[in-house]
């Protein structure tokens, strides 16, 4: 099976679907690879590097007529016509937003997989190009903001005076938002972030940011792993929060997107006007309509109030080498999934939830939209235990006279024992008493669930007792011999029981369950 990697023709696209490193991995799966000449130049991957990796350098027609075509941007109608019958195209397709492209693909007897339709489940994380590109975009958004911002991000105290740190507000704490939070925080800025999902507050704090919540936050995840649509009441309360925050910050980075829908409007025109001159807004959702009023895709707009609104839609492509490597790795992981035998033979299994969710067209048949894939929710917290209807009565404190009598009697007995006992016995009794105290506090604090493995650990202690008792079996005193025999018997029971418990514990981790003793 031949894999084709054509050059991207979309204006401004700098990424490539395979790098020399990922080409080696594809060859290791049993495929042949042809790369269009010049496909990786913008990503610092010349033709010679692909040739050294084992790929064949060919023309656009050779790449597009391969059995499996790997592409980054949505193909044009002319490129779709180049596909041979029965070919498989893997690319970003935006099927929910571009039904015309779906119809164009269905007019050909080809199969098309959308890399931007990977479900948000743990098994598909290695294929998720949206997360990979969002991570790069969040990082690059901060870099673009720093370039347009006229001051330091970090605060400084210099001989020329004190420089306050920049204040950054990140709207949306998804993959892109978290990347922006971490980058801005590492540059020394004071970072605030908000999201419709209150549970992300801990993630924001872990990256050095401060969570700014909307009063009476609502959880809106839509069951897909992405943020969902919010209510009108929530939007009004969020607008008040944004209006307060943007007046106080220097940089705003918006990342809010809803799959299959236009981007929600978060920052209104009057909010932009309230910001200080020199402030910067990066609208990462400009391609889907924008989160900010006045943002223009692929342009930097400066308002009359001196606020710069950056609407770049190619933020991942502004780091072409890194973006191509991550995109290519996601594609390699998909090809691994489609090649279960690793023999260079492509197998599309529509019973697999990941492959089914990505399949837009199969042999000219439209399979979009796929069945919904629900993300597993976190288990609910167990209900709190109800207090007992009749709490047990508190114990009466011991009588001081009784306590004094017990302590005094014990002291007298201890004095008599030490006065009339040999020094060797006193030393042994002291060690014995200390062992009782230490053992009580150590074993007494062990949780009940750990008592079984504790029996396994005590084999060594019981073994020492057995050895000591065996040394006393030949004593001249009959009493010592009897006590030694009893000690060997009791300690041996503990040893044998400990080994039995250990064997059953280890058997729990075996494929067949607990190990059974053979008859």
Regions found by a protein language model. Name each.
Residues 6-45, 155-245, 395, 416-418:
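Glycine-rich phosphate/diphosphate-binding loop of Rossmann-like nucleotide-binding domains
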Residues 460-470:
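Small-residue-rich segments of transmembrane alpha-helices in multi-pass membrane proteins
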Residues 60, 422-435, 456:
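Structural signature of hydrophobic alpha-helical transmembrane segments
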Residues 83-116, 251-310:
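ADP-ribose/adenylate-binding Rossmann-like module
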Residues 54-64, 74-75, 222-251, 256-269:
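A structured beta-alpha segment of the ubiquitous adenosine-cofactor-binding alpha/beta core
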Residues 116-118, 122-160, 165, 286, ...:
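Adenosine-phosphate binding glycine-rich loop
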Residues 347-418, 519:
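Phosphate-binding loop/pocket of nucleotide- and phosphate-handling active sites
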């Amino acid at each position: 099976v031949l894999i084709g990697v054509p050059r991207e023709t979309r204006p401004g696209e700098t990424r490539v679907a395979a790098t020399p490193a990922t080409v080696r991995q594809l060859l290791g799966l049993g495929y042949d690879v042809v790369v269009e000449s010049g496909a990786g130049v913008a990503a610092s991957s010349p033709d010679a590097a692909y040739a050294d990796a084992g790929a064949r350098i060919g023309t656009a027609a050779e790449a597009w007529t391969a059995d499996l075509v790997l592409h980054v941007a949505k193909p044009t109608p002319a490129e779709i016509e180049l596909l041979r019958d029965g070919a498989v195209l893997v690319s970003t397709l935006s099927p929910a937003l571009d039904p015309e492209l779906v119809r164009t693909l269905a007019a050909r007897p080809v199969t098309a997989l959308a890399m931007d339709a990977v479900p948000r489940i743990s098994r598909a994380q290695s294929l998720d190009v949206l997360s990979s590109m969002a991570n790069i975009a969040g990082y690059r958004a901060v870099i673009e903001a720093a370039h347009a911002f006229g001051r330091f991000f970090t605060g400084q105290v210099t001989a020329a005076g004190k420089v306050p740190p920049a204040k950054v507000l990140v709207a949306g704490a998804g993959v892109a938002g978290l990347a922006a939070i971490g980058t801005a925080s590492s540059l020394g800025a004071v970072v605030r972030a908000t999201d419709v999902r209150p549970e992300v507050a801990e993630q924001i704090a872990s990256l050095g940011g401060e969570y700014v919540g909307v009063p009476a936050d609502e959880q809106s995840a839509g069951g897909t792993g992405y943020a969902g649509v919010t209510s009108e009441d929530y939007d009004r309360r969020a607008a008040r929060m944004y209006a307060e925050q943007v007046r106080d910050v220097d940089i705003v980075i918006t990342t809010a997107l809803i799959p299959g829908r236009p981007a929600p409007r978060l920052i209104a025109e009057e909010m932009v006007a309230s910001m200080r001159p020199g402030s910067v807004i990066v609208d990462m959702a400009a391609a889907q309509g924008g989160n900010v009023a006045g943002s223009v895709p692929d342009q930097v707009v400066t308002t009359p109030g001196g606020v710069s609104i950056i609407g770049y839609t190619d933020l991942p492509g502004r780091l072409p080498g890194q973006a191509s490597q991550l995109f290519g790795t996601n594609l390699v992981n998909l090809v691994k999934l489609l090649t279960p035998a690793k023999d260079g033979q492509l197998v599309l299994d529509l019973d697999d939830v990941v492959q089914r969710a990505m399949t837009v067209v199969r042999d000219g048949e439209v399979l979009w939209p796929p069945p919904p894939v629900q993300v597993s929710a976190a288990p609910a917290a167990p209900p709190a235990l109800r207090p007992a209807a009749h709490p047990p009565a508190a114990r009466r404190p011991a009588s001081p006279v009784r306590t004094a009598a017990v302590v005094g009697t014990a002291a007298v007995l201890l004095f008599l024992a030490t006065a009339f006992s040999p020094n060797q016995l006193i030393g042994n009794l002291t060690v014995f008493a200390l062992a009782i105290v230490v053992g009580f506090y150590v074993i007494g604090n062990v949780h009940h669930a750990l008592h079984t493995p504790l029996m396994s650990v005590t084999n060594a202690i019981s073994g020492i007792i057995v050895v000591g008792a065996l040394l006393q079996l030949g004593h001249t005193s009959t009493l010592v011999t009897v006590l030694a025999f009893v000690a060997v018997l009791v300690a041996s029971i503990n040893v044998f029981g400990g080994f039995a418990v250990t064997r059953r514990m280890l058997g729990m981790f075996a494929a067949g369950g607990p190990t059974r003793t053979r008859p």
